[in-house]
Design a protein with these regions (language model features):
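Short, electropositive alpha-helical surface patch
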Residues: 75-88, 111-124, 148-157, 189-193, ...
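Active-site acidic/histidine proton-transfer and metal-coordination neighborhood
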Residues: 53-54, 69-171, 180
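Gly/Pro-rich active-site loop or hairpin
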Residues: 110, 144-148, 152, 177-241, ...
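Non-cysteine beta-strand/loop elements that form the S-adenosyl-L-methionine
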Residues: 23-28, 57-61, 170, 174, ...
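Active-site beta-loop-alpha junctions enriched in small/polar residues
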Residues: 7-11, 30-32, 64-68, 104-106, ...
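N-terminal pre-domain/capping segments
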Residues: 1-63, 67-86, 270-272
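Conserved, mostly hydrophobic/aromatic
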Residues: 17, 62, 80, 91, ...
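Acidic (Asp/Glu)-rich catalytic clusters
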Residues: 15-22, 40-60, 85-95, 123-129, ...
Length: 272
């Protein structure tokens, strides 16, 4: 059975993840909207690594949202590349299984191919001591990882640049983003794997918005516009660790983790 976890915002992600019965956890190493370098919780990477290993808890780190290595704007692309490198090294130091980064976008009027070339350069120049997992996005003109066609072009560019049969570059499938981008979740896993050959992580999120909306607003599994059975089907088909990035209020995040684990264990249908 794949591991099921949650994105945790509190100061002690390990304790919170254990309390909700998760066996994987995702968190930020610093401000997700800022350009400052990563911060190791407690300041000692070896202590963090040992604690999570002792608890048999897999770690995934989400890179800051500001990173956009695809852009032609030097004032964003260059610091993005630097911050991505810092995040990769920091994530590796605490024993993370992967670093998730959004595909980014090119500005209006800029050729999509320029974004692909910027991604190639980033992958070629950045040391990757752990897998860098590119995540699909919900909307935006010039998005590098919104449509399946765009994902295909981006994957070809980065896997070729990686030069290691793609082992240091992977893919994270976000269900809310896919639904908002107009990708049918009923066969999304098969269609993505036909492009990438792999799905390394699933962000199992429902959506507050309708199919094809282009909006990125997560909802708890039982309360969004996506049939929970479709979300469960994605997790089962992908066979990868699933992380819930859903609202925490009123115990919703913990309930999502619990429901997913129960459904995967007992293979029953949705029960409201």
């Amino acid at each position: 059975m794949p591991r099921i976890g949650a994105h945790i915002h509190v100061a002690d992600p390990l304790a919170e993840a254990i309390a909700m019965g998760a066996d994987a956890v995702q968190f930020f190493l610093g401000d997700p909207q800022g350009w400052k370098g990563p911060v190791i919780p407690g300041g000692d990477a070896s202590v963090i690594k040992a604690a999570y290993a002792a608890a048999d808890m897999d770690i995934y780190i989400h890179a800051p949202y500001v990173i956009n290595v695809a852009t032609s704007n030097n004032r964003i692309r260059i610091p993005s590349r630097k911050l991505l490198d810092q995040q990769l090294q920091a994530a590796a130091s605490i024993g993370a299984k992967g670093l998730i980064v959004h595909g980014g976008h090119v500005n209006a009027g800029v050729d999509f191919g320029e974004g692909l070339e910027n991604w190639r350069k980033a992958v070629e120049r950045i040391e990757r001591p752990l897998p860098m997992l590119i995540e699909n996005t919900a909307g935006g003109d010039g998005a590098m990882a919104r449509s399946l066609d765009a994902i295909g072009q981006l994957w070809e560019a980065v896997s070729e640049a990686a030069g290691d049969a793609g082992e240091s570059v992977g893919f994270c499938l976000d269900t809310c983003h896919a639904n908002s981008a107009g990708i049918d979740l009923a066969d999304a896993v098969d269609r993505v794997k036909a492009i990438t050959g792999r799905i390394d992580l699933v962000h199992c999120n429902n959506s507050r918005d309708p199919f094809g909306s282009g909006r990125d607003r997560h909802a708890n599994i039982a309360s969004g516009t996506i049939d929970p059975a479709l979300l469960l089907g994605v997790v089962r088909s992908a066979g990868a660790t699933a992380i819930c990035e859903t609202p925490e209020e009123s115990g919703g995040l913990a309930a999502d983790v619990s429901w997913l684990k129960q459904q995967l264990l007992f293979r029953t249908g949705w029960r409201a």
